[in-house]
Amino acid sequence: MELTPREKDKLLLFTAALLAERRLARGLKLNYPEAVALISAAVLEGARDGRTVAELMSLGREVIGREQVMDGVPEMLHDVQVEATFPDGTKLVTVHDPIV
């Protein structure tokens, strides 16, 4: 199977998000990379489902809460930027202060 670098990045992100979901299900708190992966994957999947950029910016703030991440992670994570593919092209989605 031949994958482009972009496709490899998306698969790596999905794998990290899957790991984060499993850790959350076991009651563990997420670290910084796991939180970013989970939020990013939610944005990518939302774009695939046909949601708008504005909807995804809002959705990104609802993925995980402060109680689900390790101490200090919300303060370190100010923005998450994801380049998502929409029916009309690729757009940069920025989620401001994703962990509230």
From Swiss-Prot:
Q: Which domain of life is it from?
A: Bacteria
Q: Top enzyme class of this protein?
A: hydrolase
Disulphide connectivity of cysteines: none
Places the protein is found: Cytoplasm
Q: Which UniProt keywords apply?
A: Cytoplasm, Hydrolase
- Gene Ontology terms describing biological process: urea catabolic process
Enzyme Commission numbers on file: 3.5.1.5
What SUPFAM superfamilies does this protein's entry cite? Answer: Urease, gamma-subunit
Task: From the UniProt record, give the pathway where this protein acts.
Answer: Nitrogen metabolism; urea degradation; CO(2) and NH(3) from urea (urease route): step 1/1
Q: Quickly give the catalysed reaction.
A: urea + 2 H2O + H(+) = hydrogencarbonate + 2 NH4(+)
Show the Gene3D superfamilies listed in the entry: Urease, gamma-like subunit
A GO CC term?
A: cytoplasm
Single annotated GO MF: nickel cation binding
Q: Which Pfam families match?
A: Urease_gamma (PF00547)
Looking up CDD domains in the UniProt record yields: Urease_gamma
Question: Record's family?
Answer: Belongs to the urease gamma subunit family.
Cite the record's note on assembly. Answer: Heterotrimer of UreA (gamma), UreB (beta) and UreC (alpha) subunits. Three heterotrimers associate to form the active enzyme.
Q: What is this protein called?
A: Urease subunit gamma
Q: What is the lineage of its organism?
A: Bacteria, Pseudomonadati, Pseudomonadota, Gammaproteobacteria, Pseudomonadales
